[in-house]
């Protein structure tokens, strides 16, 4: 799709592959065929193992599912730290990218919920706060700020909890045109009772 008449897509793709190879060598990788085009399909080919954060993330989630106790928590912690947000944002309108992003986001959210519960029970409120702050930055409309406020309240950081409430309320009003929901309002009442 998107090719003008008379343009050979394979020739253009070969040019892109050639330029990529040159860029990889300039970046310090050994000179070899990194991308191979066979029957119109590109595949990665290198003499050394290559690991991506997305693959490593899904492996950690799978290993967590097969584990229990401290091992499970360790895999969830690693997975959570590997997750940095949307996969291939430049291609976010491609159907396969949308589907994969939804899968990865779901895995991430489940990991955050389970880790958050573990950290709360363990009394690791600072780490729990870091966890929810990251989740809230990645997905500001998924209500992670509620857990962030709860952590701040446990840490007796009432002013900071109020600031999170105020900033979240402003974000929801400006971006979505809706006021904060009942869960957020109940947090405001709890904050006000402590200030």
Stretches with model-predicted labels:
Residues 1-130, 134-143, 160, 173-175, ...:
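Intrinsically disordered, low-complexity protein-interaction/activation regions
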Residues 117, 150-154:
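Tandem amphipathic alpha-helical repeat scaffolds
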């Amino acid at each position: 799709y998107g090719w003008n008449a008379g343009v050979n897509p394979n020739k253009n793709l070969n040019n892109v592959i050639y330029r990529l190879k040159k860029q990889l060598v300039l970046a310090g990788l050994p000179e070899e065929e990194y991308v191979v085009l066979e029957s119109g399909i590109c595949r990665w080919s290198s003499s050394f193992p290559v690991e991506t954060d997305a693959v490593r993330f899904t492996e950690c989630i799978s290993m967590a599912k097969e584990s229990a106790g401290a091992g499970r928590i360790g895999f969830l912690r690693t997975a959570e730290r590997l997750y940095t947000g949307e996969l291939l944002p430049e291609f976010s309108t491609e159907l396969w990218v949308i589907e994969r992003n939804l899968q990865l986001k779901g895995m991430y959210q489940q990991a955050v919920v389970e880790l958050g519960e573990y950290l709360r029970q363990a009394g690791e409120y600072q780490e729990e706060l870091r966890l929810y702050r990251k989740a809230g930055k990645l997905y500001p409309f998924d209500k992670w700020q509620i857990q962030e406020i709860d952590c701040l309240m446990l840490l007796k950081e009432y002013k900071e909890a109020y600031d999170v409430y105020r900033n979240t309320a402003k974000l929801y009003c400006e971006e979505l045109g809706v006021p904060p929901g009942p869960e957020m309002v109940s947090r405001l009442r709890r904050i006000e009772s402590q200030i």
